[in-house]
Each structure stands twice: as C-alpha cells, then as structure tokens.
Amino acid sequence: MSFFAKLQGSDSESSSGSESEESILSGSEGERQDKKLAAQKKQQKSKASMFLNSEESESEEESSDEDEEEMSDSDDERQAVANKFLNDAASSDEESEEEDKIIVLSAKDKRFAEMEAAIHSIQNAVKNTDWVLASSELDKLFRFIARHLVTIVASPIPAEGHIPPRFLETLVSLEADVAKTLAAEKSAPKKMAPAKAKAVNGIRQTLKKKSKEFDGVLKTYNEDPEAYTAAYEKANAAPAAPKPKKAAVTTPGEGEDDEFMTIGKGGKTLNLTADGVFKTLREIFEARGRKNTDRAETIKILTKLLEVSETTYQKIRVLLALVPARLDYSQHLVSIPQESWVTALQEFDQLISILIAEPDYLVQETVGEYDDLVERTPEVVDGKKQKVLIAGSLISLLESLDSELTKTLQHTDAHEKGDEYIDRLKHEAPLYTTIVKAQTLFEREQLSDNIARTVIRRLEHIYAKPDIIIEHFESKATQAAAGLKSEITPFDVKRDASGVIHDLAVFIYQSDAPVLRARAILYHIFNQALHGRYHQARDLLLMSHLQDTISHADVTTQILYNRAVMQVGLAAFRLGFIPECQTILSEMFSTLRQKELLAQSVQRYNIQLSPEQELLEKRRLLPFHMHLNVELLEAAYLTSCMLVEIPLLASVDTEEQRRRVTSKTFKRLLDMADRQAFMGPPENTRDHIIKASQALQAGEWEKARDLIVSIKVWSLLDNAAEVKDILAKKIQEEGLRTSLFTYAAYYDSLSLSHLASTFNLPVGRITSIISRMIYTDELAASLDQIDGVVIFHRVEQSEVQRLAQQLAERTASMLEQNEKTLDVKLGNQGQGQDRDTRAVGGEGGRQQGERRGGRGTYRGRGGRGGRGGFNQGLGTTMGRRVTAQ
C-alpha cells in the first residue's frame, strides 16, 4: 500500500469512527446508493474545479497498482455518503487532497489553486473571527488577480471571461461580513482587540479601494451571478482542449506561425493577423509597465504584427509601439544590447521613410481623440484632404536612440575592447543619416521645436570630428535623402564641413530655446578653434557673454563651455599666441580636476557621493572618442608658462616680487625641481618642460629648445612641425630676454652682433626685441645703432655696490648690538661726561638708524636717510660734541 493510500485509509477510519452513531445504508441497495452519490459528487467536483484542470496528470496519478486505486475509490464512496451529513468538513478534506495532486500540474492550475486556497482561508478566518489572517489572505488574493490579468490580457478570451466568479463572490461576501461585524461592534459591550479592529478597518479600506477598480464587473455580477458564471464558463471553454492545437503545430506551413501565436503554457493564442492588429496593440499597451510583463515576448508579438500589417496606418501604429519596446528592453542593464539597438534604428528609419513617402499621415504628440481599434484613412472635407493624425513622439524616439548609443559607448572600454568600441562607433553614420531624414520630415511639416532639437543632435555628432569624417557623414546623408528638400542645409549645394556646422549653428541662433542657443554657439566655437581659427572663436566667445552666465547653466552646458575654452586655448598655442594661451588655460589647470571638469572621469576622492549622484556623474561622462587629450593641454599650458614666467622671474629684484608670479602651479613645480639634489633624465612631458625651464634660466637656450621639441605629445597636433618651429623661435627670443634681465647689471654695453651670434637671431630681430624692452621700461638701456651696441644705464646699484652696502649694514647692526650688550653687562647708566657722550652716541645712533633704514637706490628711492640725511646726522653729532667740550 502506498503512502497516499495509507493516509486515505487512516482518514477513512477516523471518519468511520466519527460516524458510528449515524444510520448508513447497507446491503446491495446501500452499495447502489453509494455509487450513485459518488458519481454525483464527482460531477459536482468537476464543475467546481473548473480552474483546476488536470487532464495532463491523470495517467500519471492513476498508473500505480490496482490495490491503491480500489482503495481510493472506496474511500471516495464512503466520503460521498458522509457528505449527506457532514458536507462542509468532508468536501474540504477531499478538495485539499485533490489540490495536493493538481498543484504541480501547470502554472495556470497552480495559480488557481492558490486562489482557491486563499478564498478557503478567508472563509475560515471570517468564521473564526480571525481578521488578521483574513487581511493577509486577502492581499494574496489580490496579488493573484493581478498576475492573472497580466497573463490573460494578451489572450483571445473576451472580457467577460477574465475575472473569475469565485473572486467576485468572495469580495461581495467579505464586504457583507465586514459591514456586519462593524455594525455589531458598535453595540457590543466588549470592544474588539486592537489588532483585530485594525485588521477589520484595513480590510474595509482595501475593499473600498479595489471595488472602484472592479466596479463594472462587480455590478454585472451582482445583477445576476448565475448569468455571469455561465458567461465566464462559455468564454473559457474554447482553450479547454489544447491537444488539437499541439497537433496543428506539426502541419506543413503552419509550424513557424504557431511559434509566434502561442503564449504561455495554457495554449492561448493571439489573433496575429491584419484584422487583429489594433486589438492586440491595445492589449499590449494595457499590459505595458505592469509587473511580470515579458518584454521579450512583447517584442516578438510586435515583430510578428509588423509582418502581417497591410495598411500604412497599421505599420505606423505597430512601429510606434515596437521601437519604444526595444529601447525599454531591460531596466536593469546599463544599456540595451547592440543588436537590439541596431534593429530599433532600422525600424525607426523605416517609420521615418513611411511618413516621408505618405504625407497624408502625421505623427504628433497632441492629437484629438480617436478610436484606436478602427482603421483610419485620409478623408476629404470641404474639398480638402485631411491628414490622419496619430499620437506619438518621433523626436523623443530619436533622442532615445541617440542617448542609447551614447550609453553603449560610455560603458564599452575603449582600451580593453577597442575592436568592439570601433564596431559600435561605426553605427554613428547610419544614425546621422536617420537624423537628417527626420529633420527633412519635420521641416516639411513645419514642426519648429522638433526641427531645433533635431538640428542640435546633428550638431552634437559632427562638431568635434575632423573634416574628412564630416564629409563622409554628409555624403551618406545626401545619398539617403535623395529627392528630399531642406531649407537649412540644401542637398544640392556643395559646402565644406565648416560650412555645414555654420549653417546649422546659425539656424539654432534663431531658436527660442536659450539652452539650445548656448550649446549651438559652444559647438560653433569648438569647431572654429579645432580648425585653428583662434580669433573667430575668441570673438564668438566674447560676443556670447557666456562667461558671465555659465555658472547658472546646467551641468551639460558647463561641460561644453569648458571643452570650448580649452580648445580655444590650444588654438592660441598652435598659432604662437603664448601669453593668450597661458591666460586661457590657467583657470582650468589651477585645480586638480581637469578630467572631471571636462567630463572625462570622476575624481572626487574627498567627496562622499550617494549611489544616485555617482550614477548621474557617470552618465555625464563623454564617450572615449570625444575626449580631449589632457596631456597635450597640460604640455601647452606649462610650455606657455615657461616662456612667460622665466623672463619674469629673471627681471624681479626681491623675493616678494617672485611670489607674485602668475602661475602658482608652474612656480611650485619649478621650486620642487630646484630643491632636488639630483634630477635624472626627463621621463614624461612635465619633466621635459621643467628641465627646459631650468636650462632657460641658466641661459642654455639650445638645451631648452631641444628638450621642448623632443616632447612626443606634439605629434598629436595637425601642424606639429609648424608648432615646433614656433616654439624654437620663441625659446630663442625669451632666452635673449632672460639673459638681458639676468646679466645686465654686470655689463656697461653689449654688442648686437654678439647677441645675434649667441642666440642665433638676426640683428634686426635682436634690435626689435631690445627696443620693445626699452619702450616698456623693462630694461634701462639705450641703443647705439651707429656702433651696433646696447648701452646699459646704471640707474640701480651694481652687484658689487649692493654687496658692499649689505656688508656695511650688517657691520653697523653688529656694532650697535655689542654696545648695548656691554652697557647691560657693566650696569653703567651714564653719569657726567660719559652720560652725555652716550646721549650723543644715542642721538647719532638714531641718525644712523635713519640713514640705515632710509637708504635708497640710485633710482631715487631713498627717503630721509639719503645723502642729505647722512650730512645732517653727521653735523648734528659734531655740534653736540663741541658743545659738550
């Protein structure tokens, strides 16, 4: 005897023991009556368990030995007799036994078994006044119905077969029980326990809330429960026998179609034909966004609908649903799979092509109400053909496609997965072509806002690219848009890459959106600077006044501003405008956040970011192919600092003036190098520039030139050879200026020809540089062009004079200190002639202090202690001495 048979036997024994006092039929007549009752019970059970269809497991459950089957049959007969007297208890036991057998059959049967179990638990809990249990079981019941609606919404079953009658019956009865309990509670002498009272109120609120959701169905059920149950059974009778459908799958020519038509394990099919397109679309729209919705299955259904669509209206409707479905493939992935994105781009391009070819159909975000289950065609009203307006947003789909490509590139490591990154980057050209086609469509329909948003996307793709790539993009777009018209960029007019960007940017300047205007001018500035047009880029930046308002702009616009400014500084460096380059780049390199400010990495080590903030920071990062080379920018900045700051450091007289150097970053690097006892050969770009700066300070301009020219990062510039020539020439000139500032104090005059041979510059250039230094008061000298010399004017102390004056000052200070120390040691307070002498000496000391404190230079910086002060002090001292005698 099997385990289940033993359990049934024990149940039979217990039930027979409990029925010992009842009168039971016996003999042949009793046996016939037992069989008749058992048959009736089985028929009732088959009707009651309509939701627990278990035909698939009958052979498995009844394939055991003969004895077990006979035993279970006899148990059923005895229980059928007992049902005459103990209907509720025995039937619940039998249902639980059959549920134990059926619960593993299929997902559908398991869901309905859960519903039956929840309903049974609610009924028992209400009888036992266990409202806490009833509340939890009610939540389970509502979760069941939510899952049930998600799975049945895509089936061909009509609406009257969606909500089970048992569910509605439970809601109605439970609402009545709750109302009865609350009414009894008001007059009861003893109040209900707080937990139960809270549960009852919770059930009442839940029922009140859910009744609004099922208002129509509940109303129909309350009018005639039997009619509703009959309609439900009739609606669900069709898929009751799935075996013929399984056989139909193997028929020739239908196997492939059935693979798309079958949904779930219940054998329910969709009407994937031209006639059922709109109904299926509505069901998909209703199911979208709900929990446990199978997105892959939705995409498969929509793809099949696109294949069977016949009319233009059907294709547009299906494509408007299919493209967002692919873009919303998974909310847990950082970006959609590349294959899904490519397919979505192709389908969106197909949608744009259909709308271009069919001008009678227009997709807009705001349209009037219309029946989405009816085919629509253009109508003639008052002799004019009216367009068919379809609800949708083409510009949102286009921006989503563009953003998804950016996400894909952001999360692809260009170093470790370079080939994959390049493969994904190749799809930018087809996307650009689609953007151009969408722009022509929006221009034809005169959708100004959509045109501006499309043009700014088009600018974003080409503003930072070389001309050859832009020309390739434009040629592909022109071929795809053959026969189309565009007023912004006419396809029949040939223009270079800069002309295309100029036309697009000028169009955005006329837009009403300030954010788009700001970004367009930044794109334009960046492109002008990229081509080395420094003055045009600078003028655009100054005329835009963005530097005054950029702190109030959004983060994306600030990033674009930083990129544009860096490119302008690099353009100035490429043309040899060294002071301008240093001024432009100084603000960026005064911090240690260059890559963060350029949206190329996240470097906030000392700032704690929440996961949401960190995610936002990563989303703002630019793809690798749009990064600016920070090493190149740093090389340009430090080289500019070297050419500007080294002559300035040589011209200052005091340490205080040295601390007023413009670039503190460069000064710090130079001081660190000076403090090192030994500095090895340069290893990186920064080392090359620092060693070149030290060589330039020492007058070794040739060594400095070789170090700067040997920097490898210059090869990234388009005009690398020209830039190296400019730098070599600048180093020669600044080397001359540094030498004049450093050694002018040691010479009375210098030959111009000697300077020309030393610095390998023409005499005319030497004369020009010295003349400019004299004119700006940087150098106190004059030019004697007859003798070809520069004569230095001794308007300041020579080196020997300066050292002699320092020695005299220190000697006088030491003498005064020794005299004070001697007076303290001897305790001599000064009496008689010695006191007068000390007083005279003190007066003379004050005068000497004035002379020492007020010394000046030969430029006339002296105060009271000049030559006149010395004579005055000496005369006073001598006069007092004579008086004392």
UniProtKB/Swiss-Prot annotation:
Record's GO cellular component terms: eukaryotic 43S preinitiation complex; eukaryotic 48S preinitiation complex; eukaryotic translation initiation factor 3 complex; eukaryotic translation initiation factor 3 complex, eIF3e; eukaryotic translation initiation factor 3 complex, eIF3m
Annotated region (Disordered) at 1-81, 822-885
Residue runs in coiled coils: none
Q: Name one Pfam family in it.
A: eIF-3c_N
Read off the PROSITE patterns from this record.
PCI
Keyword list (alphabetical) reads: Cytoplasm, Initiation factor, Protein biosynthesis
Single GO BP term: translational initiation
Question: Is Zinc-finger tagged as a keyword?
Answer: no
Q: What is its main location?
A: cytoplasm
Q: Give the location in the cell.
A: Cytoplasm
Q: Which PANTHER family does the protein's record reference? A: EUKARYOTIC TRANSLATION INITATION FACTOR 3, SUBUNIT 8 EIF3S8 -RELATED, EUKARYOTIC TRANSLATION INITIATION FACTOR 3 SUBUNIT C-RELATED
**Family membership:** Belongs to the eIF-3 subunit C family.
Q: How does it assemble?
A: Component of the eukaryotic translation initiation factor 3 (eIF-3) complex.
- Give a short account of what the protein does: Component of the eukaryotic translation initiation factor 3 (eIF-3) complex, which is involved in protein synthesis of a specialized repertoire of mRNAs and, together with other initiation factors, stimulates binding of mRNA and methionyl-tRNAi to the 40S ribosome. The eIF-3 complex specifically targets and initiates translation of a subset of mRNAs involved in cell proliferation.
Q: What is this protein called?
A: Eukaryotic translation initiation factor 3 subunit C
| Phylogenetic placement of the source organism | Eukaryota, Fungi, Dikarya, Basidiomycota, Agaricomycotina
